[in-house]
Amino acid sequence: MSTSFKEIRVSMATTEDIRRWSYGVVKKPETINYRTLKPEKDGLFGEQIFGPTRDWECGCGKYKRSRYRGVVCERCGVEVTQSSVRRERMGHIELAAPVTHIWYFKGVPSRLGYLLDIAPKDLDKVIYFAAYMVVSLDEEGRKEDLQDLENELRLDIKQLRDACDASIASAVSELERTITELQDAKTSASRINKVRSEAENKMANIRREYDDKIEHLERVWDSFKALKVGGLYAEDDVFRDVQDRYGDYFDACMGAEAIKRRLEDFDLQKTAQELGVQIVECRGQRKVRAIKRLRVVNSFITSKANPACMVLDVIPVIPPELRPMVQLDAGRFAASDLNDLYRRVINRNNRLKRLLDLGAPRIIVNNEKRMLQEAVDALFDNGRRGRPVSGTNNRTLKSLSDMLKGKSGRFRQNLLGKRVDYSGRSVIVVGPTLQLHQCGLPKLMALELFKPFIVKRLLDLALAPNIRSARRMIERGDPAVWDMLDAVIKARPVLLNRAPTLHRLGIQAFEPQLVEGKAIQLHPLVCAAFNADFDGDQMAVHLPLSLEAQAEARVLMLASNNILNPSDGRPVTLPSHDMIIGLYHLTTVKPSAKGAGRAFSSVAEAIMAKDRGDLSISAPVKILFSNIVLDGKTLDSAVVETTLGRAIFNEALPDGHPYINELVDKQVISSIINNLAEVYSKVEVANTLDKIKSVGFHWATRSGVTVAISDVVSPPEKQEIISKYEAQARGVQQDFEIGLLTDLERRQALVSIWSEATDRVAEAMRKCFPDDNTINTMVTSGARGNWLQVRNIAGMRGLVANPKGETIPRPIISSYREGLSVTEYFISTHGARKGLVDTALKTADSGYLTRRLVDVAQDVVVRERDCGFTRGVRMPVTFRGDDGELHKVENAEHSVYGRTLAEDVKTPDDNLIAKAGEDISGIMIDSFIAAGVESVEVRSVLTCRSKVGVCSACYGRSLATGARVDIGDAVGIVAAQSIGEPGTQLTMRTFHSGGSASAVDITQGLPRVQELFEARTPRAAAPIAEADGTVSIEDGDRARRLILKSDNNEEFSYTVLKRAQLRVKDGSRVSLGDQLVEGSLDPKEVLRVKGIRAVQEYLVNGVQQVYRSQGVPIHNKHIEVIVRQMLRKVTVVDHGDTSMLPGELIDQSRYQELNREAQAEGRKTASARQEVTGITKASLATESWLSAASFQETTRVLTQAVISGRRDPLIGLKENVIIGNLIPAGTGLSVYRDVEPEPRPEAISRMYPTRRPEIENLLEGDSVDPEFDFSSLTQGLELPDDYPVQ
């Protein structure tokens, strides 16, 4: 799809818009006729509305074939067209009563509630027919007639009182007559008293009845006087009488109709002005609410949307192919949930129409309207209000909102990730004979992948007459097909991908080599990059089709071009396992080996002696070398005391490399390849790696490494060591029992004793392992395992933790070699199981962290060479040790390396070492240390002033290539991957200080990284000094109070837990920003007290601390890219005379732009406060609504985008992936795409050898002859095999 638009805007659809999209009204709830299996007319699948189910055929079959294109059948009313229109054409439902869109009144915040200034619960009452709302009021008429109406009311009340008096008088005269009669009849006094009592009760009831009527009239009158537009009134006798008596002065109604009429009369401009005045005049909650309301009102004003569109008279029906019905076995059907939800709406709508036609009572009609509203709510967002509608098996039905949000929603399932053709997958096996840029592709898989190319070649060479017969040849396995496959596979790279693709090295390009079998062969050195092993892992193969894609795969993605790890710039293609065993064996020295002390005139002579059996490869000998580099000097010849094995190893290294005359283990080979990557070209490095791999495998097979139970040597003095520490432990226990120690002190003492005992046993065990022990060889060389594992097998298990995470103060004394007792086995099971559970949880948590990081940083792309801002950040290179000497800062290669200098670097005596603008290399760092430079000013993405993305100068070197980063590099994605990829290696634990669960917890590992990136306030955050001054400490029963008295007599109080470890003493002097208590700081407090640079350093160092503690190297610049995104926003404090609102969170660049505009026009500028936003919040607050909606909270983001008419400028990567554009990064940038190639004379003469003079004249001339026959140029020209012939 070619797209030419520059931005996407989303807005609110009007009733006319929906009718314009529609191809007809859906009137019936039926889907298909189950007898004929054809769609029902006017139903949810009707062909008259949505188009034919068969290509070029009307519903009844009268018109068939494409020659009737566009004809509408007069019999069945179906247009003759392609059936694919059923994916595009929409219908609509004409509602009998308006309904409210649930997104606008049930969202948080409720947009309808803010607009009309109604509480959401009151809004709910109106919409669902539980209360009336006054929608119009004739205030002038009421005011004019108020006196007359009151006189009328008083008259009614007087009449009621007169009637009351008359009724009582009548009752009195009746009573007197009755009593006279009873007295005449000489009735008893009790009987007369009873009659009198009944009569009095009757008169009281009469009076009460009339008083109630009068009171009711008073209430009716008060209600009428208090009526206001937007007022809510329950449906009771008072309001019914208000309507009966004064209905001419106002109009009140229920449901969406009431909301619609309010919205139609709503004056946005007037409301905005009133709210603006309120913001200036009010304080507290009223001001906050006014700001929130104004935000919603302004959204409607800027988008020019009609608020009445939030109430729907018409509902769109999406195309039937997007809510399909599929026939299953046994004649049953599986249908999309949307069909059930639409059916409920249509049924209720049709019933409401019938009730209205019949003139049903209002209460029945209102109930049906409420049910229609609920049906539409369920269609748009099922479960948002009340109980969700469920289908069979009590499963909640998926609504339109559910189709958009979540992992299986439209955004993430179909728009951001698509299945691709020309791909396959298979199990991987090792390919030890492959070169670094090659992979083994099974012949059958290659045949299927390259089938279209083979078909074309068969046709071009006239080996097959047509496509069908060519396909048949391939299926038969004709011998000619294999030759074609060999030809088309040449110079065509394929992409290999292993899931999970945690970083960019998870997809690399290789040149395929055809292999037998069905497994893909993988080069052993790229396993680390893919995190692959050969225990059943599978990999996917993808075929780049276009010439551009092939060029990108070859130049950018070929495995031999991806030797360095983008996270730290160190080589990732390192020999491992058996290769290291082979190299270690090859370079080992055995002084007593055969042939020791001999001298040879060349390596060849030594090899000859070895072949004759006179010399061992490990024997120390003297060999004469020519053209050798020793101690940094190149010598024509030199005799070196070495071994033949080391000489063989050095032959694998490139010319000019220093001679390696030491035992080669994992660390040595790592530093060798590190140096190779710095000094030599990629081609030479790749060739050297292949040679080292081959040498390693060759000698690993000859090393004879085996492991037997006898190789596991337990230290004989173990029992003696244990007995000594057992005695110490008993002493501690006795001290505890007599009350000299607390339980906490006892536990700490025991843990300390047994930790020391375990270390002593481990030392003794290591001494027991001879140098030629194979387990010793494996661990020492770095091929496999570590001494901790060996200690568990041969020494003792040591201390383990209980389920609470506390260390059990009694160790497991047995080793696995000796076997554990039942008790020891039982207490060690918890740790083993916890490890497996943690791994599963970590994988999910780490994946989610990576997703959030990618989302927040996805639009950080290198956009320009230099932003022009030369101020950077100062970083230490050396520090002065206790000995007074300068030492290299421990992590200089992860902080200073690869950056651009912001200023010249000079020695203490003012000699220039490096100029501003140069990139810092490893060699340059060494020169800084030698010259005594303590710190350097470097450019950083934290200070980059590029409006969009970052600039090349501020970012510095690309760690993946070792060269200055190119324009178009997606450094944000690389940063997110570099931080997220090792996430599974981090611990999940929260450590307990002092071994007590109630003590202060120190969050570490992955949760700590999340805490920092989300800028959360830590639990029991450590306070920081808000001024220079003196601290005094007050002890309370449960807590301590630290009181800081500043130098200008201000007092600050901090309450901390009693058990918190203080960093200050009573009377200590502190400076602004000093940490007062051990623990984590609140980033927001650091920003408030110390400023933006301090919070940047705190976040970067905090994340690095976690990764370094786990031995994971990451360059600071990756963390800085994320921190830059976290500090993009500011909160407006005073909006001045700008369009911003107080309290609004706004992008810094937008804030500065609006302020510049105001300044230019002489208006008052705004002021703002810097904010640190967590990565989730920063992702949702991005300029791109497409990116935010596809991340999280889809419905909320879309609702806000719709009411404000948000425009998406399509700057980031995600939004361009969603709409199918090339991403604005790498070769997708216009700077690389809008390039006109200029042919060089050599290229012309090589391409068109016979027509050179004509072409040169053509190129030199100002204009081209329109009659020139360009096709003649290709005569006699050798075209590539897959050149597309028209």
Swiss-Prot record:
- Report the EC number(s), separated by commas if there are several: 2.7.7.6
Q: Where do the annotations place Mg(2+) binding?
A: D533, D535, D537
Q: Name one GO biological process term.
A: DNA-templated transcription
Identify the Gene3D superfamilies for this entry: 1.10.132.30, 1.10.150.390, 1.10.1790.20, 1.10.40.90, 2.40.40.20, 2.40.50.100, RNA polymerase II, clamp domain (4.10.860.120), RNA polymerase Rpb1, domain 3 (1.10.274.100)
Annotated Gene Ontology cellular components are: DNA-directed RNA polymerase complex
Summarize where Zn(2+) 2 binds, as residue positions: C867, C944, C951, C954
Q: Which domain of life is it from?
A: Bacteria
Q: Which Pfam families does the entry link to?
A: RNA_pol_Rpb1_1, RNA_pol_Rpb1_2, RNA_pol_Rpb1_3, RNA_pol_Rpb1_4, RNA_pol_Rpb1_5
Q: Write down how the cofactor binds this protein.
A: Binds 1 Mg(2+) ion per subunit.
Q: Where does Zn(2+) 1 bind?
A: C58, C60, C73, C76
**GO molecular function, a single term:** DNA-directed RNA polymerase activity
Q: Which UniProt keywords apply?
A: DNA-directed RNA polymerase, Magnesium, Metal-binding, Nucleotidyltransferase, Transcription, Transferase, Zinc
Q: Which cofactor does it need?
A: Mg(2+); Zn(2+)
Give the enzyme's main class according to its UniProt record, as a single word. Answer: transferase
PANTHER family per UniProt: DNA-DIRECTED RNA POLYMERASE, DNA-DIRECTED RNA POLYMERASE SUBUNIT BETA
Assembly and partners are described as: The RNAP catalytic core consists of 2 alpha, 1 beta, 1 beta' and 1 omega subunit. When a sigma factor is associated with the core the holoenzyme is formed, which can initiate transcription.
Q: Return the NCBIfam families for the record.
A: PRK14906.1, rpoC_TIGR
Function of this protein? DNA-dependent RNA polymerase catalyzes the transcription of DNA into RNA using the four ribonucleoside triphosphates as substrates.
The family assignment reads: Belongs to the RNA polymerase beta' chain family.
Q: What is this protein called?
A: DNA-directed RNA polymerase subunit beta'
Q: Which organism is it from?
A: Tropheryma whipplei (strain Twist) (Whipple's bacillus)
